[in-house]
Amino acid sequence: WVNKLVMGARIYDNLDSANSSTLCSWRTRGMRRVERNDILIFNYPNNDNRIAFKINYVYAKRCVALPGDSISAIDGYYKNSNYHEPLGNKRAQDYLNQVSEDRLDECIKYTIPYSYDTYPWNIRNFGPIYVPRKGDVILLDAETLLFYSKILEFETGKTFSTSSDGTVLADGEPIEYHIFTHDYYFTVGDNVMNSCDSRYWGFVPEEYIVGV
């Protein structure tokens, strides 16, 4: 069952929100914040390679990083910059630690940001990846765009690209920085070898979380 009271129940602003790709809602007062290792129920945020809301498309994954954390995997084990206790399913991570590189299925091997020449990461070794927090300021360049382009487009409604000299453009206009307006979470499945999760599609906006 899902406890919607932990974070506070999510209330839609109007009935149209339930049928829209844009979520308009607010929360009642909750009992506590999300904690690392909580299992979260949330609306799957990756639709057509962008963050968009689908009311009946719901995932259950474990939270391994909160807003303001940096998350990585080292030899198959999750590491969090602000939390030094075990994260996730240790037995599954033990298996990932031991499996040979050539046995990692190519379709699950590589993780965001999918730029292997720059970041030769895979599900056993990746990161650190910073999880955005509301109010954080990020300087924009080609590197940060690799990690946060979906968030930038979600928060601004603009299309982001880079010019030939590496300048970041928003709807064709130069932009130097961005202030995040939402909190985000990094979630993973306990079946680390076979889980569609934040390692592949990125961050979960707080507003998309249904409960714990």
What does each of the following model-derived ranges do?
Residues 1-212:
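Soluble "head" domains of membrane/secretory-pathway proteins
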